[in-house]
Amino acid sequence: MKRTALALLLLLVPFALFARSRTVRSGPIDTPAAWLGQRALGHESFARLVASSDVVALGDITHATHELHAAKQSLVPRLVAHGFRVIAFEAPYSEYKALDAYVLHGTGDPEAALNLPPYWFWDTNEILDVVQWARAQNAAGLTPPIRIAGIDATSPRVTAAEVVAYLSRVDPAYASEAASIYHCIREGYTGTNRCRTAISTVRPTMLSKRDAYVLASSLDEYEEMLYAARIVEQGERVLVAHRYEKDPPMAENVLRFVSRGQKVILFGHNEHWGRIAYQLEKVESIPSAGSYLAIALGSRYFALGSMVLDGTFLAVQYEPGVRSGSIRTHAMTAPSPDDYGVLFSLAERSSMIVPLRGPLPSWLAGTHRMRFAGSTVPILEVPADFGAKFDGVLYVRTSTPTQLRHWPTF
């Protein structure tokens, strides 16, 4: 029933995405520096502010700014102290199970698990420190324990292989059929209705054989593999539409934790966690994972975005006309006078967290300019309304590159 409700929610959300408007212009109540100074929070105060939330997203304006990763090192322990127990990454579902096994049981090698080239931006000393800290807490007896999850459905072939391996143990006859069904999403798949329909039959078949599968394995393993079959369904759509279908699965996978009573910390890019749709190179808006979460959870979802004024960061650069690329250090482009980084720099602080719920002063309300970069360059500059997009912002004056552990090429 809960899964049905979540699926229905995801179907209904797009009709409501653009109805939300939280920014209210208020008259000038003080100078920008004074207003920002009065609102600015330290990390401990921020953790208390969001303690009653079910999900707190820690968004990144670039995927590889040290100061934002360092903030996670500081914020995660404080959020865990307020009952948050799941650290969910914008990262692949199956591959990140190795990190969960490490923090839960101490098995495996977290350094090897983070060395995943498509998600190179998490393979940093800062994130490794968070993972090792989580393991230390669990080893000391923290109850309930901290879990780590990948919530991205971008590698369904890996997950499909897991499902088939499970079926080979509990139902060898059907395992062969499932393997044949999943074969259609082999390398180079571009999407067919026949494949999509066939893939969607695996999960109902597993449901119909629940008792036998639980008897042959365990309830926990059965439920995990049943959901893995759902990840394959999600991933088939992602393979076809790439990043334009990433967000609904991420939201659905987060809500699965919430439905179990777990409080979640999200790691990922700003644009995925904002409470409204976002734009990339194309004109049309993309419903964000955060927009689905905002409708599902209301004020129990807190989206902390981030911004930087200047400095450097890491991103992949592809040479013109060449399909190969490498990770390089890049400088933020110069901000326009109406850039959010410029507005927040008026506080003359190197870093601060500023809550944005409620009426905003006239100089901050409404639409201004925002620069951001993903895992690749170029840097994009777009209009944005932070009052509608985020519940708060982590401002960093000067960005420096993350402490990357490996430097893959592409």
Regions found by a protein language model. Give the residues of each.
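Hydrophobic h-region of N-terminal signal peptides that target proteins for export
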Residues: 10-17
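Positively charged n-region of N-terminal signal peptides that target proteins for export
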Residues: 1-4
